[in-house]
């Protein structure tokens, strides 16, 4: 059975090889005219300058946290000695994936614009395969990190029994998710603040005050806006999904080791299954990537169908092969567990389709939102908020159904508390299923900003109108894939956070053993800590709704979602104000900009966004890290469980609302720009621009950042469980 593990590192190497191949194929393409190259260079320099500055800040935070974890591990003995090192590698690989994705995207945009001048299909394939570099790098590095730690810990960790060794190994591996979570938080929050400070600033002065079109080279903030697309939607999205991907696999491994404690063969099967499904998903994603192509002159719906062919092919194949994996591993309930995986896969598809329905201007909700512009910006805002609230229904019901189906399939269709560990394993394997085709799913997400930048490059380089029409078509597709990608990221974050919540209970068991607690008094029974089940741990800490500590934690967790959103929203507002002041200053002081005779000072706007993002991201990030520790110290283990439940419930629903309201406002504006309700530069268009400007931080800063918040709070709780147990017992 152990031989099957080696397929996992092989799959990671295959993913990284194809990422390298697609990158070099992209670099061989012509970058276009000297103007196109110059604009691409501006964007590339701005993106890399931001990334360099961000990694300096993140590096300092990582050093401080690594020292703290070292003190807890080597000084107080409340953590495994490997935790500080696992934490650092998790952050390093996440940062490396972001760097590779950003570098690829900034090189691909001008080449995509140039390829589109030949044919629409050439542009689509180039942009999509460049996006695939990000997708395959994330899954490749994620599986590589998991493989390395599995080999290292198997060689060095030896507990009293083989069963206990597997539990310690998997719970230790789970802590490298803390590194990925911390890096993801800074990438998402910092990237979101950067991109929306530039975007909102560019829109307020450029579109609303000067009637400039999108990506007008006369707008000083336009380069910063294009840099922001890469910073937020490539590096930020990549770090977010890297965290979910690794977190779901690692949580499933930890829950599998716990659920089948005492039966080493069953433990090994449960540990290998998520790694095998993820590895097979990598190979099938590559097959799906090669299936993406389109006809010349294709419209938005045809392009969407082209991308769907690749993602659907990968999803169908993984659904079929999941049955083979569980059967080969020797699970008695192999077909039921396969249904748990399929439940996760289908949930991802349904959430994506629901997001598309509520945010694409091909459907009634966004068309009706555009129609409301006839009575001014106030009704656009009101209807957009209402649309976002209603849009939460389908994703929430979908996740609820997926949780119940995956739980029941894993327990033999029983709610008996004796099988709760098996049920939680089923839920976590559903999260792995949802993320199994991340290689191609993330490719469609990263495609969006590449196509958007290609359109911006074509506009600023004043290319032929036909080329710009083609880049606009690819850009419209990118907006839709970006919106559905956000829905997918939120759904996967919810399932992953639920799996991490269950893993927190396992980490408490390890913490109890570290402080020397051998047995627990649970009701009338005396239970060995190493063999205690999840219901027994929950019972011991009185985790129920009658416990005021749990209730207090739930309220604090729900509040955290709104506090975090408020902090990130205000951060964008403050940064955008600085950008607006700078753009107005340039229009006033640099003569000839408005006439197109003098080039604006793009670099100054890039610097403003970079500094604002670095400064403003610190407070929300520290809040997310510190609050779970403070709640644990004050309210104990039961309070932390309440915190995680409250944060997950409120954060998941709020994230969907923000992402879909913002996406609908964006596409309502585009629907008007396509000639409906007065078209560009009409009064109605100005009303939708206001909606789009308000929606920018909704969909690209606060909404996506909540994904990280609900996972990071779980990860912080897991890593600090030993300290909380030492304080409270």
Could you tell me what each predicted segment is?
Residues 1-729:
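Hydrophobic packing and interface segments
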């Amino acid at each position: 059975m152990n031989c099957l593990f080696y397929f996992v590192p092989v799959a990671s190497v295959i993913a990284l090889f194809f990422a390298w191949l697609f990158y070099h194929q992209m670099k061989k393409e012509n970058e276009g005219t000297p103007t196109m190259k110059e604009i691409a260079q501006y964007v590339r320099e701005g993106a890399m300058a931001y990334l360099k500055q961000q990694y300096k800040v993140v590096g300092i935070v990582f050093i401080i946290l690594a020292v703290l974890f070292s003190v807890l591990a080597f000084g107080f003995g409340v953590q495994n000695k490997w935790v500080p090192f696992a934490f650092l590698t998790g952050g390093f690989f996440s940062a490396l994936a972001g760097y590779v994705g950003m570098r690829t995207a900034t090189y691909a945009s001008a080449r995509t614009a140039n390829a589109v001048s030949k044919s629409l299909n050439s542009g689509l394939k180039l942009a999509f395969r460049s996006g695939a570099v990000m997708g395959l790098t994330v899954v490749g590095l994620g599986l590589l990190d998991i493989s390395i730690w599995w080999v290292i810990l198997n060689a060095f960790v030896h507990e009293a029994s083989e069963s206990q060794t597997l539990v310690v190994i998997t719970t230790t591996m789970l802590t490298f998710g803390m590194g990925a979570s911390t890096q993801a938080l800074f990438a998402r929050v910092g990237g979101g603040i950067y991109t929306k400070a530039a975007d909102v600033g560019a829109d307020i002065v450029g579109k609303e005050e000067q009637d400039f079109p999108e990506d007008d080279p006369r707008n000083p903030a336009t380069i910063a806006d294009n840099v922001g697309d890469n910073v937020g939607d490539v590096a930020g999205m990549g770090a977010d999904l890297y965290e979910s991907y690794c977190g779901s696999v690692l949580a499933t491994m930890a829950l599998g080791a716990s659920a089948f404690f005492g039966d080493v063969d069953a433990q090994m099967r449960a540990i290998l299954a998520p790694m095998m499904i993820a590895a097979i998903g990598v190979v099938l994603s590559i097959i799906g990537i090669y299936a993406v192509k389109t006809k010349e002159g294709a419209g938005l719906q045809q392009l969407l169908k082209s991308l769907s062919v690749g993602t659907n092919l990968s999803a169908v194949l993984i659904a079929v092969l999941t049955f083979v994996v569980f059967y080969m591993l020797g699970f008695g309930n192999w077909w039921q567990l396969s249904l748990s995986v399929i439940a996760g896969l289908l949930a991802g598809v349904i959430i994506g389709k629901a997001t598309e329905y509520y945010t694409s201007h091909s459907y009634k909700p966004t068309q009706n939102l555009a129609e409301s512009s006839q009575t001014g910006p106030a009704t656009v805002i009101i209807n957009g908020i209402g649309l976002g609230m209603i849009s939460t229904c389908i994703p929430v019901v979908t996740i609820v159904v997926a949780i119940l189906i995956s739980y029941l399939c894993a327990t033999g269709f029983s709610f008996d508390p004796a099988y709760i560990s098996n049920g939680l394993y089923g839920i976590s394997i559903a999260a792995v299923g949802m993320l199994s085709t991340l290689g191609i799913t993330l490719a469609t997400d990263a495609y969006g900003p590449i196509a958007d930048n290609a359109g911006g490059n074509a506009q600023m380089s004043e290319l032929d109108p036909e080329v710009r029409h083609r880049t606009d078509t690819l850009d419209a597709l990118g907006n839709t894939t970006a919106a559905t990608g956000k829905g997918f990221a939120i759904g996967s974050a919810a399932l992953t956070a639920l799996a991490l919540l269950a893993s927190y209970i396992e980490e408490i068991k390890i913490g109890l053993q570290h402080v020397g607690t051998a047995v627990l008094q649970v009701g009338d029974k005396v239970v060995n800590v190493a063999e205690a089940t999840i219901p027994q741990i929950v019972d011991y800490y009185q985790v129920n709704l009658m416990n005021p500590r749990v209730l207090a934690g739930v309220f604090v967790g729900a509040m955290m979602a709104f506090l975090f959103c408020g902090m990130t929203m205000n951060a964008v507002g403050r940064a955008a104000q600085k950008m607006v002041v700078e753009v107005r200053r340039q229009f006033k002081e640099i003569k000839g900009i408005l006439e197109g005779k003098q080039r604006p000072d793009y670099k100054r706007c890039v610097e403003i966004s970079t500094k604002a993002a670095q400064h403003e991201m610190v407070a929300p990030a520290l809040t997310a890290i510190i609050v779970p520790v403070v709640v644990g110290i004050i309210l104990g283990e039961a309070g932390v469980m309440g915190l995680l439940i409250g944060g997950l419930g409120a954060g998941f629903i709020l994230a969907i609302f923000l992402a879909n309201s913002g996406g609908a406002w964006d596409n309502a504006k585009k629907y008007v720009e396509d000639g409906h309700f007065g078209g560009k530069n009409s009064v109605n268009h100005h009303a939708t621009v206001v909606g789009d400007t308000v929606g920018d931080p909704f969909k690209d800063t606060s909404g996506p950042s909540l994904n990280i918040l609900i996972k990071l709070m779980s990860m912080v709780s897991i890593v600090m469980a030993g300290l909380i147990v030492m304080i409270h017992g």
